[in-house]
Amino acid sequence: SRAIIKIKKKYKNKIGIMCDVALDPYTSHGHDGLIDKKEILNDKTIQILIKQSLLQAQMGCDVIAPSDMMDGRIGEIRRALDKNGYEKIQILSYAVKYSSSFYGPFRDAVGSKKALKGDKKTYQMDFSNIDEALREVALDIREGADMVMVKPGLPYIDVIKEVKNKFKIPVLAYQVSGEYSLISNAIKNKILSNDAIYESLLSLIHI
């Protein structure tokens, strides 16, 4: 929140700020929601996500980006923002966030891999099921999402293309730590040239 204030004070509206909304950076167990008896408490988690979103909006965030994957959180956050006078704040939904092995290097870097108990397959997306992804995008748009994310990016270019063609809204792709590590390690071992980084990012843009 302090960073948002400082950036907005210095650059005014010359730069837009997107703010991630999730609980996993703050939970002792590494999950994106509150847990009771090994069960994710979806609705109670959403109430905290709403408070987080309102605080970020109050500080000057331009785009709220819920990455938690709780069911129904887009609609609840949209209603809370509108009710409190933040109608112009946009929502980027991590609508298609797969339960992916490609997050590994990031979790190692921030120390959440050791804290994480179990996996996130009960609330993140099944990467073998594209129909589920399309249904989730449609649902989040109905709830008020202004744009959607597909994460990871490169392994799911077909999903990005399908979402973009079907829904005609801004679609963002996230090149995650595992994707980048594959390429950077190949560069370090002189299997690929540095141009591979640029090529991998451009491939996500031109679709």
Show which residues each predicted segment covers.
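Generic hydrophobic/aromatic pocket-lining and core-packing "Φ" positions
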Residues: 4, 46, 53, 74, ...
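Catalytic beta/alpha-barrel core
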Residues: 45, 62-70, 124-129, 146-154
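Conserved small/polar residues in nucleotide/adenosyl-binding loops
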Residues: 205-207
